[in-house]
Design a protein with these regions (language model features):
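Noncatalytic, solvent-exposed loop/strand surfaces
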Residues: 1-328
């Protein structure tokens, strides 16, 4: 697996860090990586599909330490390899490994950011594909294979949990929990799970509502703009539609066109959508109706890598190309 640092304006490679992995996707898709790197305090933290966590120096790419969740925690590969992105909080790197360590639960593991040494392990659950998220400075919310967990960031102590998964074994939880204001969090998946809204209060997870037909996000995490939620509804195999819903659980609008899937980014009052067919779509985020401004074909079809946006530049890649587009 290779991690590269590039100049934003030219694409010039500043450094490259590579390690050898024998990971092969069980279903014949690309061999990763899946997880988005985390950057904090002069370090870059990566999590490879084979289970290796690596810390790199941000300026040079020099490897500082690595930790193998497969050997240390018996972290299983799952359907598509390890995919949750690292979370850096309180000087530690939180990984949804879904394993166990010397008889102890290790669904989550916290590694010291400076050394890679385990600080704590917790949660008796397998990993899904959603990434753990910070709730303030002291708590972590993690949607795993079987349950939604709220734990203490200091020691991994379980504060609260809720059962939340499909009845189908061949299912995935991929969309990361979305904060919706006032302590509310939206969690969504396909395979009959649908949309669930929870309130986190005093260290507890309180269910507010659940609707199976409102928004079932197969892969992409939805976004929130102006107190409205925008996301893809439906399975990738049968086609997805873009929907706008309210945090109260009503559908504001649904696009007529079906897509194979894609990812969403909110920038101000705009939505940037990259479809699996390699098309970039720019929309106004409005609850009245879908308001498509423009489309551009920027990549070849057949990819699922999440796009990124920073300082006016939109970044996207497929298996062969990385493109940077300045948006005005």
């Amino acid at each position: 697996m290779t991690t590269e640092a590039m100049e934003t304006t030219t694409g010039k490679v500043l450094w490259r860090s590579t390690y050898v992995t024998d990971y092969v996707d069980s279903f014949g898709f690309d061999n990763g990586p899946r997880a988005v790197p985390a950057v904090a305090d002069g370090r870059v933290f990566t999590y490879g599909p084979e289970g290796r966590v690596t810390a790199l120096d941000l300026n040079t790419g020099r490897e500082l330490w690595s930790y193998d969740t497969a050997s240390a925690l018996a972290s299983p590969q799952g359907f598509f390899g390890r995919a949750p992105s690292p979370l850096v909080q309180g000087g530690r790197v939180i990984i949804a490994a879904g394993g166990s360590r010397e008889g102890q639960d290790a669904g989550l593991v916290a590694l010291e950011a400076t050394t890679g040494k385990p600080a704590w392990t917790a949660v008796p659950d397998e990993a899904g594909y959603a990434s753990p998220v910070a709730v303030g400075d002291h708590q972590i919310l993690a949607w795993m294979r079987n349950r939604l967990w709220l734990v203490s960031a200091a020691d991994g102590r379980i504060l609260s949990s809720q059962p939340l998964r499909s009845r189908m074994d061949a299912s995935v939880n991929a969309a990361t929990p979305l904060p919706c204001g006032q302590g509310r969090w939206l969690v969504s998946a396909g395979y009959g799970v649908g949309a669930h809204l929870f309130r986190l209060e005093e260290g507890k997870i309180h269910p507010l509502w659940q609707r199976a037909d409102l928004l079932d996000c197969h892969y992409a995490t939805p976004v929130m703009v102006g107190w409205q939620i925008y996301g893809f509804h439906g399975r990738q195999e049968t086609g997805m539609t873009l929907r706008c819903i309210s945090p109260e659980g009503s559908i504001r609008w649904e696009a007529k066109e079906k897509l194979d899937g894609g990812t969403l980014i909110a920038v101000g009052s705009k939505l940037l959508i990259l479809t699996e067919d390699g098309e970039l779509r720019l929309l106004n985020a409005t609850p009245e109706a879908q308001d498509l401004i423009a489309t551009w074909q920027i990549l070849r079809a057949g990819h699922r890598s999440h796009a990124a946006y920073a300082s006016g530049i939109f970044y996207a890649r497929d298996s062969e190309h990385l493109v940077a587009i300045r948006l005005r």
